[in-house]
């Protein structure tokens, strides 16, 4: 059904909390626009991840915290008004200090976020799998978490620590344990380097855990089943759809450049029928016809009353 005629998801934070409690593990693919979000929902995914890296990438910018809170809230609302599954939103460092994080949480929850992720890097932040990251103090991150928890209505607060690549595994565990005490609902250990590290982290941090299965990074390729067995409740694939879209576009553009036609790669394209079905195109036509019919009936009654 066309999203304009669907009721929005009510209290998405509670929906996500219940989903985490009911499922062994929740798989949340990364999305960066409403069409991809709608496709992911159509395919059966029960939660989505709005990736900061994918958003900035779609704007041809690096993942350095360059977008604004207003832009992120806009992207969030575009996606949450289309789908009826909870969306986890990557808010990078929270757009400032603790008092700024309060507004960030309120704005993103108002935009429909089910969970809001904040990390412990300094600004400008970096992709979690690059060298040269720097961290704020544990105390400053605790302040942000306390502020976030105090500002939210239902949204879950995801605390990401990038300490593994800066201070080492033990410090990552220590920070995570502190963040749980501060009230974080979910802990996200970024850039762990082996399945055994993920297992050890889960043994020592008593909270729902989120694993990042990105590509071309420091984390080896680990399956959803392996993460489940290691004790993780959520696994995200944050930039996979964005990377796939770029590669597919490159293939199509090269075909047009070299052959001057796309006819030999039609099997690689989403058809008109498939796209119309995805967005509920015919629902719009039906609605337009219904409005026209009602208008005609009203005008007919009006004309009859005048002539009668």
From Swiss-Prot:
* Biological role stated in the UniProt entry: Involved in the catabolism of short chain fatty acids (SCFA) via the 2-methylcitrate cycle I (propionate degradation route). Catalyzes the thermodynamically favored C-C bond cleavage of (2R,3S)-2-methylisocitrate to yield pyruvate and succinate via an alpha-carboxy-carbanion intermediate.
* Family, as annotated: Belongs to the isocitrate lyase/PEP mutase superfamily. Methylisocitrate lyase family.
Cofactors per UniProt?
A: Mg(2+)
Q: Coiled-coil stretches, from where to where?
A: none
Q: Report if keyword Cell wall biogenesis/degradation is assigned.
A: no
Q: Identify the InterPro entries for this entry.
A: ICL/PEPM, Isocitrate_lyase_ph_CS, PrpB, Pyrv/PenolPyrv_kinase-like_dom, Pyrv_kinase-like_dom_sf
Q: Which PANTHER family match?
A: CARBOXYVINYL-CARBOXYPHOSPHONATE PHOSPHORYLMUTASE, CHLOROPLASTIC, PHOSPHOENOLPYRUVATE CARBOXYLASE
> Which organism is this entry from?
Aeropyrum pernix (strain ATCC 700893 / DSM 11879 / JCM 9820 / NBRC 100138 / K1)
Pathway noted in the entry: Organic acid metabolism; propanoate degradation
Alphabetic keyword roster:
Lyase, Magnesium, Metal-binding
What SUPFAM superfamilies does the database record attribute to this sequence?
Answer: Phosphoenolpyruvate/pyruvate domain (SSF51621)
What protein does this entry describe? 2-methylisocitrate lyase
Q: Where does substrate bind?
A: 51-53, 127-128, 160, 190, 212-214, 243, 272
EC number of this enzyme: 4.1.3.30
- GO terms of molecular function: magnesium ion binding; methylisocitrate lyase activity
From the UniProt record, list the reaction(s) this protein catalyses: (2S,3R)-3-hydroxybutane-1,2,3-tricarboxylate = pyruvate + succinate
